[in-house]
Amino acid sequence: MAVKVGINGFGRIGRIVLRNALLNPEVNVVAVNDPFIALEYMVYMFKYDSVHGRFKGTVETKGGKLIVDGKEISVFGEKDAGAIPWSSVGAEYIVESTGVFTTIEKASAHLKGGAKKVIISAPSADAPMYVCGVNLDSYDSQHAVISNASCTTNCLAPLAKVIHDKFGIVEALMTTVHATTATQKTVDGPSNKDWRGGRSVNGNIIPSSTGAAKAVGKVIPSLNGKLTGLAFRVPTLDVSVVDLVCRTEKSATYDEIKAAVKEASKGPLKGILGYTEDHVVSTDFIGDNHSSIFDATAGIQLNKNFVKLIAWYDNEWGYSGRVVDLLVFAAKKDGAL
């Protein structure tokens, strides 16, 4: 049995969510909606990817549908989310990956077309945010619109949870060195709300804001107000890294901290939080399915209560995997799977 899924928005996350969904037998993507991409171009965009490589299966069109590995996927081109005929193909769970409909009010438009649940693949100002491995125990089936938070929150929260549960976080600051995303500019251009954000991503390190650290306070309430952060956008295509500096309540050696993270990576956070002692760099994590991979050899400690921890994440592939995981979890809790 598989839950029938629709994807709204066939951009970076939409396409990689589909690649991830095809690997999960509990997910059946039956439709994609994107008013800005013609069907033939969808085939091309799904087949070729500058970061994750060529799709290893078959992709073609037939009868106005997208055919992936012989599987038919209906294609719609509606700009109005409320006009997408999800019910015509039986799609009940919708991945909202346009980056446009990120509030409950806007994302709820999908319900008009027959959807039962919407998973926003971005942070939301008002929808409940869930991070796999961190706060799924607070899931409430009554909410028709939920958020998978951000890729950075998905990296930071599991690590912060381990440290907070084991040693207690008094306060912390986070920096994410973040790969390029689609909203950035290839050459300098106007950006009235974010002047630095209007500068060319090519050849620049760009300081930026991020709500990822504060969002951890929403998924781990006991950390609310104890954590904030910022971002540096850098000219790499994929894979980002979190630098978490925290002061702990309990004294601990760096080896004790490493041991706690390693234990969690093999136990309750297996598949979510990874652990490595190898001397790695960013490209080593392209295609890594973990939300967060703790780099044990990159961190440093000033004293037994003050430490800098490093965690990598494929901000495209790893995050998209969690979108699919959250969708499956919700479907099971809702009794749809």
From Swiss-Prot:
Pfam families: Gp_dh_C (PF02800), Gp_dh_N (PF00044). Its EC number is 1.2.1.12. It is an enzyme of class 1 (oxidoreductase). One of its GO terms (biological process) is glycolytic process. SMART domains: Gp_dh_N. Gene3D superfamilies: Dihydrodipicolinate Reductase, domain 2, NAD(P)-binding Rossmann-like Domain. The active site is at C151 (nucleophile). It catalyses: D-glyceraldehyde 3-phosphate + phosphate + NAD(+) = (2R)-3-phospho-glyceroyl phosphate + NADH + H(+). One of its GO terms (molecular function) is NAD binding. Pathway: Carbohydrate degradation; glycolysis; pyruvate from D-glyceraldehyde 3-phosphate: step 1/5. GO terms for cellular component: cytosol. InterPro entries: GlycerAld/Erythrose_P_DH, GlycerAld_3-P_DH_AS, GlycerAld_3-P_DH_cat, GlycerAld_3-P_DH_NAD(P)-bd, Glyceraldehyde-3-P_DH_1, NAD(P)-bd_dom_sf. The record marks H178 as: Activates thiol group during catalysis. PANTHER family: GLYCERALDEHYDE 3-PHOSPHATE DEHYDROGENASE (PTHR10836), GLYCERALDEHYDE-3-PHOSPHATE DEHYDROGENASE-RELATED (PTHR10836:SF76). Belongs to the glyceraldehyde-3-phosphate dehydrogenase family. NCBIfam families: GAPDH-I (TIGR01534). This is Glyceraldehyde-3-phosphate dehydrogenase. It comes from Lentinula edodes (Shiitake mushroom). The gene is gpd.
